[in-house]
Regions:
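Sequence/structural signature of beta-propeller domains
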Residues: 1-222
Length: 222
């Protein structure tokens, strides 16, 4: 309600798709409709009530009010005028989706209704060799996405080009005492873009700093 003055309070809103209230975006096998990779949807926002959530049903009430239904939303990042976020178990194989939201140039103003923001299904695959359970995400200095996994098997660091092509950067070779592979978390870059930081969550927890010619990316080969 007061741009640039968050301390004054405002309204909690949820993303909805224009003309498709309560849209199920999961693309699970039992979903009532499918959304294609690259498909772009107009966005509007619905106000949420009772946001202190006394009945622990805010998400359910949001969908009933018209908000889109996303599954297991986790990592999110804003960069280059776009918002990217992961749905860790989205897609037909339930191994992840990456969505992109491009805000309207009138975001937050009445004119937004005539020129809405755009939501696009940016990445979705049924091949776990390319991506499995995308979780934390960041935007690299050269414009690619860097995505880390919280999968059921090996945990990888993946890259995604602006065209949506996936490639592999690294694999977590560490194994915990019980034989499990720990998830990778918190990828981010140094201000000069030369160092990639990330965490391995357990076994024990560690933070790594990796130098590299990061712009020399190469497509994944499987």
């Amino acid at each position: 309600d007061h741009p640039g003055q968050l301390w004054r309070g405002g309204r909690l809103q949820a993303l909805a798709v224009v003309g498709r209230p309560g849209l199920d975006t999961t693309n699970w096998p039992d979903s009532p409709e499918a959304i294609a990779v690259g498909e772009t949807l107009g966005v509007q926002w619905v106000d949420l009530e009772e946001i202190d959530n006394p009945g622990n049903d805010l998400a359910v009430r949001g969908v009933a009010a018209g908000a889109a239904n996303f599954t297991r939303g986790e990592g999110a990042w804003f960069g280059n005028g776009e918002v990217y976020f992961c749905c860790t178990d989205g897609g037909p194989a339930k191994i992840g989706q990456i969505w992109r939201y491009r805000p309207s140039r009138f975001e937050g103003y009445a004119q937004e209704a005539s020129e809405p923001g755009e939501l696009t299904l940016f990445v979705e695959t049924e091949d776990s060799r390319l991506l499995e359970k995308c979780d934390n995400i960041t935007v690299a200095p050269w414009g690619d996405l860097i995505v880390v996994e919280d999968g059921d098997r090996e945990q990888y660091i993946r890259g995604v080009t602006p065209e949506g092509r996936l490639y592999t950067i690294g694999r977590n070779a560490a194994v915990t005492a019980d034989g499990e592979k720990s998830e990778i978390t918190g990828p981010c870059f140094s201000p000069d873009g030369t160092i990639l930081f990330f965490n391995v969550q357990s076994g024990p927890g560690r933070t790594f700093a990796v130098r590299g010619p990061w712009a020399r990316r190469s497509p994944a080969s499987v």
